[in-house]
Swiss-Prot record:
It is found in: Cell membrane. The chain crosses the membrane at residues 28-48, 88-108, 125-145, 147-167. The keyword tRNA-binding does not apply. The gene is pgsA. Keywords: Cell membrane, Lipid biosynthesis, Lipid metabolism, Membrane, Phospholipid biosynthesis, Phospholipid metabolism, Transferase, Transmembrane, Transmembrane helix. Pfam families: CDP-OH_P_transf. Its EC number is 2.7.8.5. One of its GO terms (biological process) is glycerophospholipid biosynthetic process. One of its GO terms (cellular component) is plasma membrane. The lineage of its organism: Bacteria, Pseudomonadati, Aquificota, Aquificia, Aquificales. This protein catalyzes the committed step to the synthesis of the acidic phospholipids. Pathway: Phospholipid metabolism; phosphatidylglycerol biosynthesis; phosphatidylglycerol from CDP-diacylglycerol: step 1/2. This is CDP-diacylglycerol--glycerol-3-phosphate 3-phosphatidyltransferase. Gene3D superfamilies: 1.20.120.1760.
Amino acid sequence: MNVPNLLSLSRLILSPLILYFVLEENYLSSLVLVLFLALMDFLDGFFARKLNQSTRMGKILDPLADKVFTFFSLLSYTFFSKERLNPLIFFLLLGRDITLIIGGIFLIKRKFTPEPSIYGKFTTLFVSLSLLSVGILNVYDVNFLRILTNVLEIVSLILILVSWVDYTLKGFKMIFKE
């Protein structure tokens, strides 16, 4: 197993610990783990490109690790932490991702390759910043950060909806383009 795949597998295995630390009210450890796993996510992609070690297994492991990491982070910081993320973010992302999975399977069966969306990338960025902000708020109660978190959550919600519509429209265009 190469380095990028080992990093992805490690993220997959370690992600549930975020929930464990939050349930134990060990918010500093959960925040450190979230930051560590985010760094590992960056490094697995970096090594895959720089060492030319992109593999079929990695193309499955990396997005799976991303989804598991996101799920446990969102679950932990939406429902179980002292400071909580807006639950609409969790439910809208869940709905969007279920739609993407079903649509992706349908497109792949019809020999289409689903393309990433710039809106999806911005959604990931702002949801990640929202999670990080809530994670920090659980450790340090900073009033400015509370305001920033609210703004990040609003932007995240808008981007989730925009990316959902964008992915759906692109999927329909591919299907009806035949």
